[in-house]
């Protein structure tokens, strides 16, 4: 059996100090995301989305972030998927960005709301044709009997809508409105830097910053 105890990296690329951190977590996220882009990391927009179902079971999966502004973090999916059902009963979620090459993580927690129909329509129209057809063909998270069934549905949707499939009513966006955002920078000897931004209406610019023990 593979031995895992000796698999370790001593992080030493950078530090994260309160004096250097932006007072607003969205500005800090933008700074780190731009650095991930500049480092040419593969798909720096990938994140883990964690949800909880009606039975209390947690579930996590990788999704793509498609928008960030002062309102929150936006992603799109099938509302009838497992995550969609989870978010319908528990509209709270957590996101995790992990940029191992930069020895960084960003952890985000908050409430979930659906984006407007206009936002969902606009993003759906920007997707490649195959992805728009796939949104109709796939009953995401449902059991199917074979790959052939999925491909038959894809063909039927393509024949029905041609080059202009509309957005399915079961497909659209969610926005996570954060109440906390943690920035983690790996440091030597596991004494990592962790800065936690917590929403605070009484603070300026609406967030307090705390250092967490690693």
From Swiss-Prot:
Belongs to the pyridoxamine 5'-phosphate oxidase family. One of its GO terms (molecular function) is FMN binding. It catalyses: pyridoxamine 5'-phosphate + O2 + H2O = pyridoxal 5'-phosphate + H2O2 + NH4(+); pyridoxine 5'-phosphate + O2 = pyridoxal 5'-phosphate + H2O2. SUPFAM superfamilies: FMN-binding split barrel. It is an enzyme of class 1 (oxidoreductase). This is Pyridoxine/pyridoxamine 5'-phosphate oxidase. The lineage of its organism: Bacteria, Pseudomonadati, Pseudomonadota, Betaproteobacteria, Burkholderiales. Pathway: Cofactor metabolism; pyridoxal 5'-phosphate salvage; pyridoxal 5'-phosphate from pyridoxamine 5'-phosphate: step 1/1; Cofactor metabolism; pyridoxal 5'-phosphate salvage; pyridoxal 5'-phosphate from pyridoxine 5'-phosphate: step 1/1. InterPro entries: Pyridox_Oxase, Pyridox_Oxase_CS, Pyridox_Oxase_N, Pyridoxamine_oxidase_dimer_C, Split_barrel_FMN-bd. Substrate binds at residues 8-11, 66, 123, 127, 131, 190-192. Binds 1 FMN per subunit. Signal peptide: none annotated. The gene is pdxH. It comes from Burkholderia cenocepacia (strain ATCC BAA-245 / DSM 16553 / LMG 16656 / NCTC 13227 / J2315 / CF5610) (Burkholderia cepacia (strain J2315)). FMN binds at residues 61-66, 76-77, 82-83, 105, 140-141, 184, 194. It holds the Pfam family PNP_phzG_C.
């Amino acid at each position: 059996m593979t031995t895992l105890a000796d698999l370790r990296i001593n992080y030493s690329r950078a530090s994260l100090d309160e004096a250097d951190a932006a007072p607003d977590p969205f500005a800090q996220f933008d700074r780190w995301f731009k650095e991930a882009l500049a480092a040419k990391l593969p798909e720096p927009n990938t994140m883990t989305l964690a949800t909880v179902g009606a039975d209390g079971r947690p579930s996590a999966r990788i999704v793509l972030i498609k928008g960030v502004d002062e309102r929150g973090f936006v992603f799109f999916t099938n509302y009838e998927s497992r995550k969609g059902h989870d978010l319908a009963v528990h509209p709270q979620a957590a996101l995790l960005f992990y940029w191992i090459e930069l020895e960084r993580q960003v952890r985000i927690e908050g409430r979930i709301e659906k984006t407007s129909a206009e936002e969902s329509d606009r993003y759906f129209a920007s997707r490649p044709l195959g992805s728009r057809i796939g949104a109709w063909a796939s009953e995401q998270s449902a059991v199917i009997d074979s790959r052939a069934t999925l491909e038959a549905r894809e063909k039927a949707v393509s024949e029905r809508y041609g080059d202009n499939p509309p957005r399915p009513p079961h497909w659209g966006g969610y926005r996570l409105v954060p109440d906390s955002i943690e920035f983690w920078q790996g440091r030597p000897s596991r004494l990592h830097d962790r800065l936690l931004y917590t929403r605070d209406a009484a603070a300026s610019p609406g967030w307090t910053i705390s250092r967490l023990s690693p």
